Regions:
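N-terminal amphipathic/basic leader segments beginning at the initiator methionine
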Residues: 2-34
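Glycine-/charge-enriched secondary-structure boundary and capping motifs
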Residues: 2-8, 25, 118, 122-136, ...
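Residue-level signature of catalytic and energy-coupling elements of molecular machines
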Residues: 12, 65, 178, 250, ...
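Residue-level detector of flexible, active-site-proximal loop/helix-junction positions
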Residues: 20, 52, 68, 144, ...
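Glycine-rich phosphate/pyrophosphate-binding loop regions near the starts of catalytic domains
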Residues: 31-187
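Glycine-rich beta-alpha junction loops
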Residues: 43, 162-164, 186-190, 198-201, ...
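Acidic, glycine-rich loop-and-beta core segments that form the ion-binding/anion-interacting portion
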Residues: 177-218, 222
Length: 345
């Protein structure tokens, strides 16, 4: 028997090195002067002193997230340049809920067989998203795992770190009945509900990713691949105008029904007014194809609202004014006395 090597077992070290060569310039372009290490280090060094000088009592906020089975849509289309945007946006939005400014990002890309060009495409999306919001992509990991992942599939995970002034942490504790619920529009499914959406379109509907449906402007695949909106600029535009946001909810898995209660204090519920914002065509199409009940749609998908602000009724106009030209703002409901839950009316 001749000599064997690692590559014959399914792991190609040279491919990993090639991937690093392809992404290194893009990754470095996200670095600020706070980043003290380059690619290839065992860890990432980030100088906190210049950051901490801007805070009286800094609190670090971290979150970890993935993009779920949206990667399957990317694989079917052979288009991987937006799922990196999804990864950064999903993680960043989760810490924005507390008023934290995202600073650094780490990524993990796993697959059955490492293809450097695909890794480059995925990371290019992260780089784009990081540069748009001032986040440094300080490190990452690629894992080639034969026999673990199906051929051609990828798993993406991102870890984000941010900072917030302790006195300015948005906790939701000051929310009270009479406050107004504002919705910021999504542009699609974002990164949640893809197993359900794939079942509806591909199993029940019998569609292919390249098929066109009259009510959708793009093909099924491109509609589903629409990148997750990053709300960093939205949140800080409002906060920098010294408008008091009492609570923020990132509308992810569980939709409005499951996510808004996560930021409500005891004794407060929310009534959502159906029809108070435009539901995107993709959701209406899925509901029709799958004959899905309304409540299930609102629990599985964001239904066209990607982030929710809860504010005093007197601040509604100020929020709309601050975000004019950046996003539409819809008054979608109100805070009421009662159980910590969301009701649709």
């Amino acid at each position: 028997m001749g000599n064997i090597d690692y590559k014959s077992a399914g792991v190609d070290i040279d491919a990993g090195n090639e991937a690093i060569d392809l992404i290194k310039d893009g990754v470095k372009s996200t670095f600020t002067s706070n980043v003290l290490t380059g690619l290839g280090s065992f860890g990432s060094l980030y100088d906190l002193k210049p950051i901490l000088e801007k805070y009286d009592h800094p609190v670090m906020v971290q979150s970890i997230d993935g993009v779920g089975t949206k990667t399957i849509i990317a694989r079917k289309l052979g288009k991987f340049d937006t799922i990196g945007i999804d990864l950064l946006s999903a993680a960043a939005n989760d810490i924005l809920v507390m008023g934290a400014r995202p600073l650094t990002f780490l990524d993990y890309i796993a697959n059955d067989k490492l293809k450097p060009k695909i890794v480059e495409e995925i990371v290019s999306g992260m780089v784009k998203a990081c540069k748009e919001t001032g986040v440094s992509l300080v490190g990452g990991e690629t894992a080639e795992m034969p026999d673990t992942y199906l051929p051609g599939e990828h798993d993406l995970v991102g870890i984000i770190t941010g900072m917030v002034e302790k006195e300015k942490i948005i906790t939701g504790k000051s929310i009270k009945p009479g406050n107004v619920v504002l919705g910021l529009p999504s542009n699609g499914l974002h990164t949640n509900g893809y197993s359900f959406a794939r079942k509806i379109f591909f199993e029940i509907g019998g569609y292919d990713v390249n098929d066109m449906i009259p009510k959708l402007e793009k093909s099924v695949g491109l509609t589903l691949l629409e990148p997750h909106i990053n709300y960093t600029n939205h949140v800080f535009t409002v906060l920098n105008n010294e408008i008091d946001i009492k609570g923020i909810a990132h509308i992810t898995g569980g939709g409005l029904i499951e996510n808004i209660p996560r930021v409500l204090p005891d004794g407060c519920g929310v009534k959502i007014q159906k029809g108070s914002w435009p539901i995107l065509p993709v959701f209406n199409v899925m509901q029709s194809i799958g004959d899905v009940g309304e409540n299930e749609m609102f629990r599985a998908f964001n239904m066209g609202v990607g982030m929710v602000f809860i504010v005093d009724s007197n601040d509604v106009g100020f929020v709309k004014g601050a975000l004019k030209g950046l996003a539409e703002v819809y008054k979608i409901g109100s805070v009421v006395d009662g159980e910590k839950r969301v009701t649709l009316k």
